[in-house]
């Protein structure tokens, strides 16, 4: 399989399991995508940031939303949603 398809499958697995797993499990699933230059990296980071936000871990969420904003190849919709979340809910 093409690398980007593999990364999409990893992202979908994380998305499907995000309500059921711990922080460590989610990180373990997403690490291959987060540590790559994949087009799915911004999506994976956004999922992780929203996971932390839902767990009331606002500082971790804020750090990850900020990482998305400086990614050179971040999806523009993901970037905009990250900026909105920072402005609206995390005081940026």
Give the positions of each predicted feature.
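Soluble extracytoplasmic domains of inner/organellar membrane proteins
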Residues: 1-92
């Amino acid at each position: 399989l093409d690398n980007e398809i593999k990364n999409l499958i990893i992202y979908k697995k994380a998305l499907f399991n995000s309500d059921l797993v711990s922080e460590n499990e989610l990180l373990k699933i997403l690490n291959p995508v987060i540590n790559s230059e994949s087009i799915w990296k911004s999506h994976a980071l956004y999922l992780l940031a929203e996971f932390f936000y839902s767990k009331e871990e606002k500082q971790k969420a804020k750090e990850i939303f900020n990482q998305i904003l400086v990614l050179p190849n971040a999806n523009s919709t993901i970037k905009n949603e990250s900026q909105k979340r920072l402005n609206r809910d995390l005081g940026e």
